[in-house]
Amino acid sequence: MALKIRLTRGGAKKRPYYRIVVADARAPRDGRFIDKVGAYDPMKAKDDPARIVLDNEKIQSWLAKGAQPTDRVLRFLDQAGLAKRPARNNPQKAEPGEKAKERAAKRAEKAAAPAEDAAA
């Protein structure tokens, strides 16, 4: 059974409130869970200590048992010092694709052609 530490949504329409839970990865987002290990209230101010509440002991025990946090929960755990989030370094992501490079080359070629005609 693959365990995930993830968010389940609660609250009312336009008033989200999330519980941080340990659940089977195959269970629905708001479905059955094994243990509640924290809460996240995005409606509170960013500097409010009650915005993210974590039960450190429970989280450490579930991480030791092999539970994998989702990206958002891993961000919370990194801020709390419970887990280290690896740095994402993908320099190729900012590079344009092949088609975009071809279009840019054609555009530069077209821009250079009228300039040559005007000079002649």
Swiss-Prot record:
The UniProt entry's coiled-coil ranges are none
Q: Where is the composition biased (Low complexity)?
A: 111-120
Keywords of this protein's UniProt record, alphabetized? Ribonucleoprotein, Ribosomal protein
Q: What GO biological process, any one, is recorded here?
A: translation
Tell me which Pfam families the record gives: Ribosomal_S16 (PF00886)
In this chain, composition skew of type Basic and acidic residues spans 95-110
Disordered: where is this region? Answer: 81-120
Kinase in keyword set = no
Molecular functions (GO terms): structural constituent of ribosome
Highest taxon of the lineage: Bacteria
Which InterPro entries would you find in this protein's record?
Ribosomal_bS16, Ribosomal_bS16_CS, Ribosomal_bS16_dom_sf
GO cellular component, alphabetical, reads: cytoplasm; small ribosomal subunit
Transmembrane stretches, start-end? none
Give the family this protein belongs to, as stated in its UniProt record: Belongs to the bacterial ribosomal protein bS16 family.
Q: What is this protein called?
A: Small ribosomal subunit protein bS16
The species this protein belongs to is Methylobacterium radiotolerans (strain ATCC 27329 / DSM 1819 / JCM 2831 / NBRC 15690 / NCIMB 10815 / 0-1)
Q: Which gene does this sequence derive from?
A: rpsP
